[in-house]
Amino acid sequence: MNKEIKSIRGMYDYFPKDLKIWNYIEIIFKEVLNSYCYLEIRLPILEKTEIFKRAIGNVTDVVEKEMYSFNDRKGNNLTLRPEGTVGCVRAIIQNNLLQKSNKFWYLGPMFRYERPQKGRYRQFYQLGAEVFGLDTEDIDLEIIILTNRLWKRIGIDSFITLEVNSIGSKIDRVQYKKELVNFLKKREYLLDEDCKRRLYTNPLRILDSKNQDIQNLLKEAPLLSEYISFSENNHFKNLCNMMNHHGIKYKCNPHLVRGLDYYNSTVFEWKSNKLGAQNTICAGGRYDSLVQEMGGRKTPAIGFAIGIERLVLLVKSLKIFSEVIEESNVYIIFIGDNNKCHAINLSEEIRDLYPKLRIFINFLHQNLTKKIKNAISSLARIIILIGDNEIKKGFFLVKDLKEKKEYHLLKKELILKIQEIFK
């Protein structure tokens, strides 16, 4: 007995019903990013494992537990990218891209070995955007305004909230980590197993624990904001003042940290309470040391990533986008194989004149009644019938399914009717 063929756990197929929403969202992404002068780049899904370890941090969950890594035939250790920023930074260093531009965006699959659940998959798609060379809070603000504009264009701005924080510099966090660890060690018996592990590897990640008991415990913990420098604190205050001025609603979350070691200063997340546990739609922040740490010159930077699957889940749950799929605009039915060539020729002539129309020819061996039923179920606007009688008399029988009318039209008249209907 043959084993049933299945996809890999946590990796999913996507079909036209969902991809209609995906494509709609991607069009909005591209239009908005273009309006802010971002340029698209396309990056490999495989990178050398070492660059992720150096950039993300050896004691992060991503590197310790979640990366898909393997040796190729020459013994090179490679990893399916778990996120996009590191590959983008590698590309701009390797190709000297900062000589030409400083704003880039990319879209594609990422891979993490996590426990699959709604909104969290082992292969998932992200849109990422990165800005290099600017260290003031002005670009932090522009990034946040840009993402806010995306939500407005998609129609979800009323169902998504912004959380912001400053995690200071790496130097600021050294002293804070000591104080946080001292606080938590005295209460280690109250920690869950995951937090006990993080206490000795990456204690800052305890701050964003989803365990409510841990969050209650952290109410008494020292605050990171009390340990960041004057300049970092001033940067964050200026950003908050600017967001207030521009009408951006936000919440300061002192426990917001990012799971990747390269972040510093401003961090932010856009969340929705409509998605359950995996409620972060978009996350980002500054990473002013990463370019230099990866071998480039010192270059401040900031970026964000949007989880496409979670965004699609939100759009679907809010029912703000029609899931109806229009399979065709024009549905051509030929009667008799001798008229197949006429159907093909007509379809190509229409495509030449109206390249945006969706034209379907029914090549199935079905009776006329069945073919017409298929045309109706495909949500076609018009049916064009081509039979011996039509060819002999030089006209086409056209059925307008929306207006429930029939026409007998010469080819020139047919072309004009199509222009009239689909103008």
Curated annotation (Swiss-Prot):
Q: Which GO terms describe its biological process?
A: histidyl-tRNA aminoacylation
Q: Where in the cell is it found?
A: Cytoplasm
Is Secreted one of the keywords UniProt gives this record?
no
Reaction(s) catalysed by this chain, per the record, are: tRNA(His) + L-histidine + ATP = L-histidyl-tRNA(His) + AMP + diphosphate + H(+)
Domain of life of the organism encoding this protein: Bacteria
Q: How does it assemble?
A: Homodimer.
Q: Which PANTHER family match?
A: HISTIDINE--TRNA LIGASE, MITOCHONDRIAL-RELATED, HISTIDYL-TRNA SYNTHETASE
UniProt cross-references to SUPFAM superfamilies, sorted A to Z: Class II aaRS ABD-related, Class II aaRS and biotin synthetases
Q: Which family does it belong to?
A: Belongs to the class-II aminoacyl-tRNA synthetase family.
**Pfam families named in the record:** HGTP_anticodon (PF03129), tRNA-synt_His (PF13393)
Q: Which Gene3D superfamilies match?
A: Anticodon-binding domain, Bira Bifunctional Protein, Domain 2
Identify the enzyme class: ligase
* A molecular-function term among this protein's GO annotations: ATP binding
Q: Enumerate the UniProt keywords alphabetically.
A: Aminoacyl-tRNA synthetase, ATP-binding, Cytoplasm, Ligase, Nucleotide-binding, Protein biosynthesis
Annotated protein name in UniProt: Histidine--tRNA ligase
Q: Which organism is it from?
A: Buchnera aphidicola subsp. Acyrthosiphon pisum (strain APS)
Gene Ontology terms, cellular component aspect? cytoplasm
CDD domains attached to this UniProt entry: HisRS-like_core
Stated EC number for the protein is 6.1.1.21
